[in-house]
């Protein structure tokens, strides 16, 4: 319960932060850690158009908050892909990756996508 209250508070703060976007020019994909403790890790990602991220995996579920939305194409290690359309100001749940799988993310749009990611370190 305590963890969910903390997560709800963090999400509320992050949604407020999403209203004020950085005016800096983005030249490459960035991942900036915002906060980390024993329960969660929070980072901001700025994903430039058409530049695939390296293959990686997520062991735990996470919430994505779109600060600047767009369409993210997610390609798994077998070549299967799916698209996620993230609207600015909205939050989305992404479950942990299946055991033994990896994926790469590609911004399918023409503008950078900015998201805040809140990843749980313990699923239960």
Identify the function of each model-found stretch.
Residues 58-78:
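Glycine- and acidic-residue-biased ligand/ion/polar-headgroup-sensing regions
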Residues 50-54, 90-105:
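Histidine-centered metal-chelating micro-motifs
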Residues 1-4:
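Positively charged n-region of N-terminal signal peptides that target proteins for export
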Residues 6-16:
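Bacterial N-terminal signal peptides
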Residues 35-39, 78-97:
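Short acidic-glycine-tyrosine-enriched beta hairpin
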Residues 28-54, 59-64, 117-118:
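A short glycine-rich, His/Asp/Glu-containing loop-to-beta-strand
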Residues 98-121:
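Ligand-binding loop in jelly-roll beta-barrel domains
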């Amino acid at each position: 319960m305590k963890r969910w209250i903390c997560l709800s508070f963090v999400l509320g703060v992050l949604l407020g932060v999403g209203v004020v976007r950085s005016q800096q020019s983005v030249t490459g994909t960035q991942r900036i850690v915002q906060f980390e403790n024993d329960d969660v890790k929070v980072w901001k990602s700025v994903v430039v158009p058409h530049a695939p991220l390296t293959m990686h995996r997520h062991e735990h579920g996470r919430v994505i908050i779109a600060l600047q939305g767009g369409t993210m194409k997610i390609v798994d290690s077998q070549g299967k892909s799916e698209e996620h359309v993230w609207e600015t100001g909205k939050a989305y749940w992404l479950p942990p990756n299946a055991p033994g799988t990896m994926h790469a993310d590609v911004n399918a749009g023409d503008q950078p996508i900015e998201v805040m990611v809140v990843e749980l370190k313990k699923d239960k």
